[in-house]
């Protein structure tokens, strides 16, 4: 390799140290005196001076090897220190005992130092024990869950319920529950968090045991340990499922050494001394320059030193690295020597100087070391660097994290090192995503947030309560000063975090560089391959938790990736005017169907990819010019058929036998919950003779298109970016897409991966972090209540005052802590910049969906997650970022709302989308969308034809699809217009706890008259739209209310039993749901009757009379069940069972009343008479049910007792805040009208013989005869029956026609055809 900046090329491959034949020639490189001075300057030390005999001779390259050997000679005591040590038993290399020292199911890393719990409570110990002296080891906490860390003896027996600390001779510290364990448990120590380091110390001279957390002693935990014959203590840990740690017994330098205690594994003292001496020589080379002309040595700063190809310098370095290279392959020496040297460079110099020196050092490593040596060295270096970054404590200026990131950047700026690390280390061996994570401090005191944010503040009225909260008070001057001081502290914190984030973005910019292709493939294309495999692990391994990257890492990685991506996108636009800005980014639709990007086994909108290829192959050929090979289709189909029948390969079956006897099982490294530096292979330890692992079937093979397609690993730059004859990723451009590319194709694939990342776990984590804000609100309410009680408490009650004062202090301290932690969360997760990232991702998805929709049937190839991300990212902006930052200030906010509304309105019933889950998500998103005024207005702004199409889909018959959400949408469009339907919370429910005012169900009514008008117009169009829709609504109402009555009968029977009994909470929930469905269906009927009354009252329509009779029948059934005093419904409501809070008289009775008022009061006189006659003709009609609405008592039946005079009666007049005076007057008018009409009907009615009654309903006289079978019934019954079934009700003969029938008439007249 030619060193950059060198004056000549020097290949170390052909270099060998001087031989005897060459000695004379070599010594003539420079003057003998100058060479002697130079070598003495490099290889001499006041501490390790050479012997006198050697010092009298001039130092040259002939005697330099002898001189170096003497320099590196180590005392015999240090050499022998690696042997057996008194007080310790076992191998000198200490690891976890994977052969027999464990219990339960565990995943152990390849280095046998990291472990992941894979069962309820697994335990494992080390291979080495101690019986005398003072010892310690460190545990790196990767997850903060339930774990017990400490010591045990070999006689301890554990199981999956009892672990370390649960037996007599085992001792443990549990930072999750902040306790210590030795059979019994007591409080001890502090809570730990992911990223902490626990030091476990044992003093067997004094018989004590203690722990440290991040180097701070937690005090003595146990005393009087059992010692003596047979008592030796092993490091041990018990951990629950998914929890993970990594041990350091001394194989690496201890992060927090303790004076007087030694690690279980001795450090390589002799090699450490040699490495430090060689490093001193190396540093001397970098600080000295030869001037052969003047014959003198010049001191020079390391940052200005350059390798200029001078033979003297090259030979000197060759001698150094001849001894140094083998040492730099050892983990301990890399971290203790090389890492310290490089960090010193970064800490002392400017970033530019540091990068220059590190670049020179890496050049020399690649030049003078064999490839395998420098690769091992770089691997260990990055592992140590990542470990240091992840497990460093948070300090106020984040200085430690900044230094580690600056060193990482300096290393990655070296092109050859960067490509090696990308290809082999960053994604394969260690978790490079950790570099982009900023951990949240659990203990704000240790993170220095008290100094950074000295003044705390929290809102006195929760922003989650909504802007209309009646408790909002005007801010006082003192509160204003506190808030401003708090905001200044938050701003200081944000600026410091932004420094770290900018360094993390620089790392990704280096990994996304595509101009460094001089020595092979550019970094960006290596990154793309590794990034896609990373996504595959997290998308395909959801059932295996250890395979998943923690979501908190994903959130940070996504934001840094978006920043780097947009930087390169806009940079490309600057040099290519025809490209687009990142603000206009989207994924072209051909990416989804041309097979160039692997989407693993992720679901497409139209179903399975193999199915889409078969059914849409003609469309692919005609629209995209892509031909699918029929043989490949056939083989893919056969693979799908045989998938469940394929036996496991032999090589996958053999490890299962080892597993059954508790042996190690190599696995593809999950490692996401364990040490950040694990090898790719793990060992699966199990004490049970069962297998929990099944071999995964290889992912689908690459599909043949018009040009060749390759697997992710085989792709080249040309396959991605394309060439003059190949469009690369954009193969198969549909005619709707522009010819000019948006940007570089590789950036499109990165963007696609970013969208997938959000769907995998980022959205879930964003919702989880809101919990800190909720905690602040709850404690603020508790503090406010306590202060109110203090003001009201009498001064003579000093005991109560003391308790309240104590509570006030506890709440204030907790709020101080939480407000500082909330500032950290807002700065790292919910900042304005992060909000803009999520908003940009939302707009990318919207444009992608819009462009995909234009391709017609090919839209089915789009992965489902694009629609999911569009829905979820909007939800995150509104619910998670909204309380902190205003959405209205986002650029193009109104336009984005409208575009999202158009997508939801069009695709919630799109036949191209077949997945049940995504269809439900679209329906729920639309239902939520119409609950909020600003988003409902956006729905009203979409083009008229789209609005009409949406309403038409909402009015489709309910039997053909899931209908509950559809009905909910229609109800929301009506809420605020119905009778007594202006409430947000039901009148009988009190606001007893803090609730999220952003919930859709708690929004104030915001009806849409525009969409109501579309509904009215559609119901009047065509003879079948209204009857089919209303028939389905009436059917579902009949079902829902019948189910509700049946369930409350069971609940009532259970409540009346004398023995103790419990009602299943799920049954109560289903019962309440059926009640809510009944109410919402009644409201839809009320809306329909109000908007289009002629559907029921214009009897020139063939179905109007039938629909009106069915409606009257159902209304009477509901009234009779609900209004009967001391009846079933009344008794269940009185019980006030938890889960049935929504079940009450008011919501269902006002819905029924609204329908009756519309039929009997508001319409024309002729229509009112028709409705009245039908209602009174129904045999279930009872006037007392109407009287009940206004609280008028029911006259007692003969033989029954009079009702209690003090019994509280239901009356609509009691709800003056919810029902207007005009509405009450209409109810009174309706009651008067029905009282008069029922009296007249009773006087005019004639007795009817039983033979003349309809044999179906026994309520109306026979008026129709069926042809050809001749059976008879009333018209209402047969018309209702024919709406759903064309067979005779009695004999199942197909009905051809229905004819009018009158008793005594000789002929019948055909009234309607079946």
Curated annotation (Swiss-Prot):
Its Gene Ontology molecular function terms?
Answer: ubiquitin protein ligase activity; ubiquitin-protein transferase activity; zinc ion binding
Zn-finger (RING-type) intervals are 1254-1292
Give the binding site residues for Zn(2+) 1. Answer: 1254, 1257, 1274, 1277
Residues with Phosphoserine modification: 675
Q: Which residues are modified to N-acetylalanine?
A: 2
Q: Where does Zn(2+) 2 bind?
A: 1269, 1271, 1288, 1291
Q: Protein name, please?
A: E3 ubiquitin-protein ligase RNF123
Q: Where is this region: Interaction with NFKB1?
A: 968-974
Q: How is it modified after translation?
A: Ubiquitinated, leading to its degradation. Deubiquitinated by USP19, thereby stimulating CDKN1B ubiquitin-dependent degradation.
Q: What taxonomic classification does the UniProt entry list for its organism?
A: Eukaryota, Metazoa, Chordata, Craniata, Vertebrata
Q: Residue positions of the PTM Asymmetric dimethylarginine?
A: 683
Other notes: RNF123-mediated maturation of NFKB1 restricts tumor growth by promoting activation of the NF-kappa-B complex, leading to expression of tumor suppressor genes. Activation of NF-kappa-B promotes tumor suppression via CD274/PD-L1 and chemokines-mediated mechanisms.
Q: Which GO terms describe its cellular component?
A: cytoplasm; cytosol; nuclear membrane
Pfam families, A to Z: SPRY (PF00622), zf-C3HC4_3 (PF13920)
Which terms does the UniProt entry file under GO BP?
protein maturation; protein polyubiquitination; proteolysis involved in protein catabolic process; ubiquitin-dependent protein catabolic process
Q: Which SUPFAM superfamilies match?
A: Concanavalin A-like lectins/glucanases (SSF49899), RING/U-box (SSF57850)
Q: What is its EC number?
A: 2.3.2.27
Where located? Answer: Cytoplasm
């Amino acid at each position: 390799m030619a060193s950059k900046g060198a004056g000549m090329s020097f290949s170390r491959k052909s270099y060998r140290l001087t031989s005897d034949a060459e000695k004379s020639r070599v010594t003539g490189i420079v003057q003998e005196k100058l060479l002697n001075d130079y070598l003495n300057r490099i290889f001499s030390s006041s501490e390790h001076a050479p012997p006198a005999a050697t010092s009298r001779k001039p130092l040259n390259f002939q005697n330099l090897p002898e001189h170096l050997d003497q320099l590196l000679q180590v005392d015999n005591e240090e050499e022998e220190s690696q042997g057996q040590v008194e007080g310790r038993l076992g191998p000198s290399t200490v690891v976890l005992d994977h052969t027999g020292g464990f219990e339960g199911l565990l995943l152990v890393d390849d280095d046998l130092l990291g472990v992941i719990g894979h069962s309820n409570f697994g335990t494992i110990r080390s291979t080495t024990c101690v019986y005398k002296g003072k010892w310690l080891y460190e545990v790196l906490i990767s997850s903060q869950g339930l774990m017990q860390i400490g010591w045990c003896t070999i006689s301890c027996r554990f199981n999956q319920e009892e672990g370390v600390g649960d037996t007599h001779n085992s001792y443990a510290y549990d930072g999750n529950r902040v306790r210590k364990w030795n059979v019994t448990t007591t409080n001890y120590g502090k809570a730990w968090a992911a990223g902490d380091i626990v030091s476990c110390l044992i003093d067997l001279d004094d018989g004590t045991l203690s722990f440290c957390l991040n180097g701070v002693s937690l005090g003595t935990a146990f005393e009087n340990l059992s010692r003596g014959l047979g008592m030796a203590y092993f490091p041990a840990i018990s951990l629950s499922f998914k929890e993970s740690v990594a041990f350091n017994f001394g194989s690496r330098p201890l992060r927090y050494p303790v004076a007087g205690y030694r690690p279980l594994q001795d450090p390589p003292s002799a090699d450490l001394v040699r490495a430090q001496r060689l490093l001193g020589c190396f540093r001397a080379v970098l600080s000295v320059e030869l001037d052969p002309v003047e014959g003198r040595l010049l001191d020079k700063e390391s940052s200005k030193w350059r390798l200029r190809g001078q033979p003297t310098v090259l030979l000197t370095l060759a001698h150094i690295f001849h001894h140094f290279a083998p040492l730099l392959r050892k983990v301990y020496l890399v971290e203790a020597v090389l890492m310290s040297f490089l960090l010193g460079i970064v800490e002392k110099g400017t970033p530019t100087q540091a990068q220059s020196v590190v670049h020179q050092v890496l050049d020399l490593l690649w030049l003078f070391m064999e490839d395998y040596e420098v690769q091992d060295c770089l691997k260990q270096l990055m592992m140590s660097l990542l470990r240091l970054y992840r497990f460093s404590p948070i300090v106020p200026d984040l200085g430690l994290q900044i230094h580690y990131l600056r060193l990482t950047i300096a290393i990655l700026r070296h092109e050859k090192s960067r490509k090696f690390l990308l290809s082999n280390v960053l994604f394969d061996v260690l978790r490079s995503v950790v570099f982009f994570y900023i951990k949240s401090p659990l203990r704000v005191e240790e993170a220095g947030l008290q100094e950074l944010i000295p003044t705390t503040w929290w809102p006195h009225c929760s922003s989650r309560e909504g802007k209309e909260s009646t408790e909002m008070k005007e801010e006082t001057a003192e509160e204003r000063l506190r808030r401003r001081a708090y905001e200044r502290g938050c701003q200081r914190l944000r600026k410091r975090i932004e420094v770290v984030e900018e360094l993390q973005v620089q790392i990704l910019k280096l990994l996304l560089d595509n101009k460094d292709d001089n020595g092979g493939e550019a970094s960006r294309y290596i990154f793309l391959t590794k990034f896609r495999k990373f996504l595959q692990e997290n998308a395909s391994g959801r059932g295996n938790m250890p395979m998943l990257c923690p979501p908190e890492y994903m959130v940070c990685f996504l934001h840094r990736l978006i920043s780097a991506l947009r930087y390169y996108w806009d940079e490309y636009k600057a040099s290519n005017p025809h490209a687009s800005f990142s603000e206009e980014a989207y994924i072209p639709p051909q990416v989804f169907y041309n097979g160039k990007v692997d989407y693993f086994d992720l679901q497409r909108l139209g179903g399975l990819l193999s199915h889409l290829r078969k059914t849409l192959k003609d469309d692919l050929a005609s629209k995209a010019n892509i031909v699918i090979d029929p043989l490949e289709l056939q083989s893919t189909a056969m693979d799908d058929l045989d998938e469940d029948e394929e036996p496991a390969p032999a090589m996958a079956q053999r490890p299962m036998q080892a597993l059954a006897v508790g042996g190690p099982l190599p696995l593809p490294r999950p490692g996401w919950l364990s040490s950040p530096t694990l090898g790719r292979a793990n060992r699966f330890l199990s004490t049970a003779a069962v297998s929990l692992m099944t071999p995964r079937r290889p992912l689908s093979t690459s599909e043949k298109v018009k040009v060749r397609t390759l697997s992710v690993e085989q792709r080249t730059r040309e396959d991605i970016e394309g060439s003059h004859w190949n469009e690369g990723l954009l193969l198969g451009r549909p005619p709707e897409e522009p010819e000019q590319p948006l940007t570089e194709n590789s950036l499109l694939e990165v963007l696609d991966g970013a969208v997938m990342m959000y769907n995998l776990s980022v959205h879930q984590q964003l919702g989880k972090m809101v919990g800190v804000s909720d905690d602040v609100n709850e404690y603020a309410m508790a503090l406010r209540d306590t202060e109110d009680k203090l003001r009201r408490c009498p001064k003579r009650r000093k005991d109560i005052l003391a308790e309240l004062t104590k509570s006030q202090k506890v709440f204030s301290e907790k709020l101080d802590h939480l407000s500082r932690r909330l500032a950290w969360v807002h700065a790292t997760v919910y900042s304005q910049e992060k909000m803009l990232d999520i908003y940009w991702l939302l707009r990318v998805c919207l444009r992608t969906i819009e462009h995909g929709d234009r391709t017609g049937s090919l839209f089915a190839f789009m992965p489902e997650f694009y629609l999911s991300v569009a829905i979820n990212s909007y939800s995150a902006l509104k619910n998670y970022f909204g309380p902190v930052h205003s959405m209205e200030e986002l650029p193009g906010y109104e336009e984005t709302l409208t575009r999202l509304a158009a997508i939801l309105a069009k695709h919630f019933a799109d036949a191209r989308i077949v997945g049940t889950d995504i269809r439900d998500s679209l329906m729920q998103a639309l239902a939520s969308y119409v609950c909020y005024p600003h988003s409902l207005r956006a729905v009203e702004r979409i083009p008229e034809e789209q609005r009409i199409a949406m309403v038409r889909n909402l009015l489709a018959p309910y039997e053909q699809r899931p209908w509950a959400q559809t009905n909910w949408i229609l109800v929301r469009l009506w809420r605020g217009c119905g009778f007594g339907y202006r409430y947000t919370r039901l009148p009988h429910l009190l606001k007893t706890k803090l609730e999220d005012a952003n919930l859709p169900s708690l929004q104030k009514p915001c009806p849409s008259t525009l969409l109501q008008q579309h509904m009215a117009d559609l119901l009047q169009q065509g003879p079948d739209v209204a009857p089919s829709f209303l028939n389905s609504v009436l059917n579902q109402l009949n079902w829902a209310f019948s189910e509700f009555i049946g369930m409350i009968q069971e609940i009532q029977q259970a409540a009346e039993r004398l023995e103790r009994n419990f009602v299943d909470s799920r049954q109560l929930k289903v019962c309440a749901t059926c009640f809510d469905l009944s109410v919402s269906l009644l409201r839809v009927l009320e809306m329909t009757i109000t908007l289009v009354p002629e559907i029921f009252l214009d009897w020139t329509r063939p179905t109007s009379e039938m629909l009106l009779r069915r409606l009257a029948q159902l209304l009477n059934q509901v009234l009779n069940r609900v209004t009967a005093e001391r009846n079933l419904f009344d008794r269940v409501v009185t019980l006030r069972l938890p889960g049935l809070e929504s079940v009450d008289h008011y919501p269902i009775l006002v819905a029924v009343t609204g329908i009756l008022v519309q039929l009997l009061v508001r319409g024309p006189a002729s229509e009112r008479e028709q409705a009245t006659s039908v209602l009174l003709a129904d045999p279930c009609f009872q006037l007392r049910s109407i009287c009940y609405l206004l609280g008028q008592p029911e006259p007692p039946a003969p033989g029954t007792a009079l009702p209690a005079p003090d019994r509280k009666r239901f009356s609509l007049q009691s709800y003056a805040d919810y029902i207007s005076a005009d509405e009450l007057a209409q109810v009174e008018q309706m009651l008067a009208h029905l009282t008069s009409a029922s009296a007249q009907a009773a006087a005019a009615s004639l007795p009817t013989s039983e033979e003349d009654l309809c044999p179906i309903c026994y309520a109306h006289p026979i008026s129709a005869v069926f042809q050809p079978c001749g059976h008879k019934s009333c018209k209402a019954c047969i018309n209702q029956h024919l709406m759903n079934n064309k067979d005779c009700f009695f004999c199942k003969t197909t009905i051809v026609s229905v004819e009018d029938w009158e008793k005594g008439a000789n002929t019948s007249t055909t009234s309607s055809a079946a």
